[in-house]
Regions:
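ATP-dependent carboxylate activation and anion-phosphoryl transfer catalytic cores
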Residues: 1-68
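Residue-level signal for inorganic ion chemistry
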Residues: 5, 94, 132, 191
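Structural motif
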Residues: 66, 130-132, 152-154
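Short amphipathic alpha-helices and their capping/turn segments at secondary-structure boundaries
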Residues: 79-86, 135-146
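Hydrophobic anchor at the start of a short beta-strand
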Residues: 90-92, 128, 190
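Conserved nucleotide-sensing/catalytic segment adjacent to the nucleotide-binding pocket
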Residues: 104-141
């Protein structure tokens, strides 16, 4: 989207015939002059830009998979990302091992921090994304996405080491971990580890 400023007597007529000229091409145009012009009536340019970028029949969300648990979450996240990659999707992965785009490693330190994970969501080439998180990241930073298509819970994390975040006992953990289920879209699904009784109990939600 660019803004083109031109001087013309009549914009409906060819420029050459009336000596019109382009004054400026702006890669980041302001919308205020169109929404609140000094003269003339306002134009819904924001709506027109959004309609151009997102057609009515287009899907505004990419498939997002969230993974949380006590152990095996990193391996699970990498496996899911690989399966999505095999489907031909340009897949972003945020895990304890780093930040990945397809088979390329963008960051070889933990990519679970909110800002690191956001790098995937703002990347226009990403067609699917997998996010590994921990109870600590969930409590301190929240999830880097608002909703997901699939939420995976591999095990019920322990409360040990979370006292600074007001988690004193293991009994509080289901209320923390169920967040991964609560953000699943209505047309999505939660995947619970049936070998973990505490995780299975989350099915009631």
């Amino acid at each position: 989207i660019a803004g083109v400023d031109l001087v013309a007597l009549d914009i409906s007529k060819p420029m050459k015939a009336q000596g019109a000229a382009i004054v400026e091409v702006n890669a980041g145009p302001g919308l205020l002059m169109h929404l609140k012009p000094a003269t003339g009536k306002p134009r819904p340019v924001g709506q027109a830009i959004a309609a151009h970028l997102f057609a009515p029949e287009s899907e505004p969300r990419i498939p997002v998979v969230g993974v949380i648990g006590q152990e095996n979450t990193t391996g699970t996240s990498h496996l899911i990302a690989w399966l999505l990659h095999l489907q031909g999707l340009q897949t972003g992965l945020s895990s304890a091992k780093g930040l990945f785009l397809g088979q390329r490693c963008l960051q070889n330190q933990s990519g679970m921090e909110w800002e690191s994970a956001q790098r995937l969501l703002i990347n226009r080439s990403v067609e699917a994304a997998v996010f590994e998180t921990t109870a600590r990241h969930l409590l301190s930073e929240g999830l880097p996405y608002d909703r997901c298509l699939v939420g995976v819970i591999t095990a019920m994390p322990k409360a040990e080491g979370l006292q600074d975040l007001y988690i004193q006992s293991d009994e509080q953990m289901p209320n923390v971990v169920r967040t991964q289920m609560d953000v699943v879209l209505p047309n999505g699904m939660a995947v619970l580890n049936a070998d973990d009784a505490e995780v299975v109990n989350l099915a009631q939600y």
